[in-house]
Amino acid sequence: MRSALRVLPKRRLSPRLPQPRFYATLNPNTPPPTAAYQVFDEPSKDLQRSRAIIRLRELQAAKANAEPAQGESQISAEDGLRVVDYLREEVSERLAERIGDLRVPPSSIMDLSAHAGQLTQILQDVLADEVPGQGQNEGQGRQEALYRDQDSCFISPPERIQASPSDLLAHPEIEPLKEQVEAVVSSGGLQWVGDIVGGLTQVRHLLKPDGVFVGAVFGGDTLFEMRTSLQLAEQEIRGGIANRVSPMINPTDAPSLMNRAGFTSVTVDVEDLTINYPSMWELMADLRDMGESNAILGRRATIGRDVLVAASSIYQELFGNEDGTVPATFSIIFLIGWKPGPNQPKPSKRGSGQSALQDVL
């Protein structure tokens, strides 16, 4: 019985060629990119500030034209424009205390991110001088904020204080001031600078040798209550979360940022300021009227009222006070750093000590 198996002829196998592989390589001699990483949408931030000024002016005009109710006084022009200045004024007062603690009062000061001049106004009392000064111009919204109260006595900076609304210092107007001021101060403006080290480096260039920088920036756990509530609500309704609150500086990173910018004898301290609001809606309205809304690049245009309603309920449930209000935490990072100079105290050379530490202890 023959087998049913068939014997196939031998086939000549062709050699299999290896598949090509592609690699992304970087020449080690290639210099790093020079453009700074952009975090914030600066045109949107200027637009937010301009709208905030317009909105407050309209509010002031509407209240000024309305008939005051019985027992109410007609709102003044100054009060109408300073409805939401409470936060900047509080931060500026705390920053002015640190400026007043300097052993030698600086003879020339530049106030960056001056907003409507809150810090400049407070420094008038510290410096006891009332000679009119000058201001720099950068950004329409910042210019409008700086000269918001120009018809009143609110803006009258001393000659040694130069108020500037700019957050970034890469502008021709500030070039002549390099190494010509003894102190640079900034109250609540550095959080909108994407390249913190680059901005602080330019601040150092403004200072004379042995000059000092004193600044306050929001960071850390600022608005953590609202951030948590929005994330929980958006995760529940949308199935994902987006950046609804601008990124903040970590207090533990602040000393290294100052050192990388070239400052010495760096001092960093943090203070938490808690403000109670009737609800999350009033908090968001005040942030909008301050011009401090989210301005991160690539943010979603809308959030949805359903998410906001859910976030407001979560806010009240998780963080609400017994009286029905909700707290909002603002973590203020105070920075003090000195530009290197010949008169600064320096550590002695290693091994130059004349007595052992164990003898002292």
Can you annotate each of these PLM segments?
Residues 214-282, 290-303:
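Conserved catalytic/acceptor-binding region of the Class I
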Residues 183-189:
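Hydrophobic beta-strand segment of the Class I
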Residues 24-107:
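Class I SAM-dependent methyltransferase Rossmann-like catalytic core
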Residues 191-193:
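A short His-aromatic
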Residues 1-15:
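N-terminal chloroplast transit peptides
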Residues 100, 261, 278-361:
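C-terminal lobe and adjacent flexible extensions of AdoMet/dcAdoMet transferase-like proteins
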Residues 97-183, 197-201:
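Class I SAM-dependent methyltransferase SAM/SAH-binding core
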Residues 197-212, 227:
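A short glycine-rich, Lys/Arg-flanked "PGG" loop and its adjoining helix->strand segment in the class I
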